[in-house]
Amino acid sequence: MKNIAIIGASGYTGAQITSLINAEMGLSIQGLYVSENSLDKGKALAELYPTYSHIHLCLSPLNDDAKAAIVEQADAVVLATDHVVSLHLAAWFYQQGLAVFDLSGAYRFEALDKYPKWYGFTHEYPQVLADAVYGLAEWNAEKIATSKMIAVPGCYPTASLTALKPLADLLTDVMPVINAVSGVTGAGRKAQLHTSFCEVSLTPYGVLGHRHQPEIATQLGQEVIFTPHLGNFKRGILATITVQLAQGTTAKDIEAAYQCYDNAPLVTVKQNQFPKVDDVVQTPNCLIGWKFDPETNYLVVTSAIDNLMKGAASQALQCIKIHFNELLK
């Protein structure tokens, strides 16, 4: 039995990972934590999320006593916290010898110089960063199994990279174009005017400046054009990706490239069939559909995930189970 502490458990992602870990044989929850200043401290998780009324745990403030208890009792920590908060907490718990699964962007880039531009802070822990592994579960399992500092990928990068990485050897120098739509939960639980019921509408945001663009490009090894959109639905991501493939590429070459997922139970790839967001909501799956035009060598790929599941919590659970050598269900 491995004990997992969850910090930031009051948010959508934190609550989701709590539910998943609570249901896992072989894993137990050491405690649920929020910041000392949180208005949710002391509340039961079920008070915030009646859906989780079967989870009889309260949200404790993360003070010094709580941190000491985590170090003594837990095998791993999940951080569902803000980037700057995770920056410091991840380094501290890692240095105490715990496995850290960080859902923020604080450890996703290897290069220190990317953090001031894309996250607005200077990274203070270069040695911890050097030890961090990018937790794209289907692609980095060996490193995830041996590292104690796992940077769980962002939601858009998970959808995009799962679709694109098998094609890396078939791409030309023409930048892939990624247009992706996310549900409102991707913006977090905090009340904001543009995500309120009467205001939310399909709209692009972060155009030519979203921090997930360099994350995708870094992991793919090629620059991309990425445009995220806010959709007027609760959860899910649908990415539509247009790429140019090398001259002479055939549909059979594409089929062969995607055979890398033949033994990946959570990824399904189909030719000429395209997923809907509803196909993946509340699941840990990634559904990919593609169609190829041999006359122009252009390929259109769609990738659908649940942003709170495969895009965050269930991928973190995958990483936890890989790290602790448990088989995926």
UniProtKB/Swiss-Prot annotation:
<dbReference type="GO" id="GO:0003942">
    <property type="term" value="F:N-acetyl-gamma-glutamyl-phosphate reductase activity"/>
</dbReference>
<dbReference type="GO" id="GO:0070401">
    <property type="term" value="F:NADP+ binding"/>
</dbReference>
<dbReference type="GO" id="GO:0005737">
    <property type="term" value="C:cytoplasm"/>
</dbReference>
<keyword id="KW-0055">Arginine biosynthesis</keyword>
<dbReference type="Pfam" id="PF01118">
    <property type="entry name" value="Semialdhyde_dh"/>
</dbReference>
<dbReference type="InterPro" id="IPR000534">
    <property type="entry name" value="Semialdehyde_DH_NAD-bd"/>
</dbReference>
<dbReference type="GO" id="GO:0051287">
    <property type="term" value="F:NAD binding"/>
</dbReference>
<comment type="pathway">
    <text>Amino-acid biosynthesis; L-arginine biosynthesis; N(2)-acetyl-L-ornithine from L-glutamate: step 3/4.</text>
</comment>
<keyword id="KW-0963">Cytoplasm</keyword>
<comment type="function">
    <text>Catalyzes the NADPH-dependent reduction of N-acetyl-5-glutamyl phosphate to yield N-acetyl-L-glutamate 5-semialdehyde.</text>
</comment>
<dbReference type="GO" id="GO:0006526">
    <property type="term" value="P:L-arginine biosynthetic process"/>
</dbReference>
<keyword id="KW-0028">Amino-acid biosynthesis</keyword>
<dbReference type="Pfam" id="PF22698">
    <property type="entry name" value="Semialdhyde_dhC_1"/>
</dbReference>
<comment type="similarity">
    <text>Belongs to the NAGSA dehydrogenase family. Type 1 subfamily.</text>
</comment>
<protein>
    <recommendedName>
        <fullName>N-acetyl-gamma-glutamyl-phosphate reductase</fullName>
        <ecNumber>1.2.1.38</ecNumber>
    </recommendedName>
</protein>
<dbReference type="InterPro" id="IPR023013">
    <property type="entry name" value="AGPR_AS"/>
</dbReference>
<keyword id="KW-0521">NADP</keyword>
<feature type="active site">
    <location>
        <position position="155"/>
    </location>
</feature>
<dbReference type="InterPro" id="IPR036291">
    <property type="entry name" value="NAD(P)-bd_dom_sf"/>
</dbReference>
<dbReference type="InterPro" id="IPR050085">
    <property type="entry name" value="NAGSA_dehydrogenase"/>
</dbReference>
<dbReference type="InterPro" id="IPR000706">
    <property type="entry name" value="AGPR_type-1"/>
</dbReference>
<keyword id="KW-0560">Oxidoreductase</keyword>
